[in-house]
UniProtKB/Swiss-Prot annotation:
The modification O-(phosphoribosyl dephospho-coenzyme A)serine is found at S25. The lineage of its organism: Bacteria, Pseudomonadati, Pseudomonadota, Gammaproteobacteria, Pseudomonadales. Its main location: cytoplasm. Subunit of malonate decarboxylase, it is an acyl carrier protein to which acetyl and malonyl thioester residues are bound via a 2'-(5''-phosphoribosyl)-3'-dephospho-CoA prosthetic group and turn over during the catalytic mechanism. It comes from Pseudomonas putida (strain GB-1). GO terms for molecular function: acyl carrier activity. HAMAP family: Malonate_deCO2ase_dsu. Covalently binds the prosthetic group of malonate decarboxylase. It comes from the Bacteria. This is Malonate decarboxylase acyl carrier protein. Keywords: Cytoplasm, Phosphoprotein.
Length: 99
């Protein structure tokens, strides 16, 4: 098991919180909750050791160059593909946009 932490600039805090996916479905669950203004923080707990570079590249593609709400994201991963990660994050952000 490996725990990874990432930070990106963000706008104002998001209002809602949500849980999408589960570790046994697509091998990934994502919890999104309001964070501190100006900061999007991500913590990944993964069963795949040595995957920090893959996660960093995925998050850079998603979060750099766009104003996201300030949230804390907790990801519990058991070997999900980048496509599943992106899908779950998009689902989560869509959910909090409706709260």
């Amino acid at each position: 098991m490996e725990t990874l932490t990432f930070n990106f600039p963000a706008a104002e805090p998001g209002r809602g919180r949500t849980l999408v996916g589960c570790v046994s479905s697509g091998d990934l669950e994502v919890l999104i909750e309001p964070g501190t203004a100006g900061s999007l923080q991500i913590q990944v707990v993964t069963s795949v050791n040595g995957s920090a570079a893959r996660w960093a590249q995925l998050f850079q593609r998603l979060f750099e160059g766009r104003a996201w709400p300030a949230v804390n994201i907790d990801i519990h991963d058991f070997g999900a593909t980048p496509g599943v990660v992106r899908l779950r994050l998009e689902q989560g952000f869509e959910e909090i946009a409706h709260d």
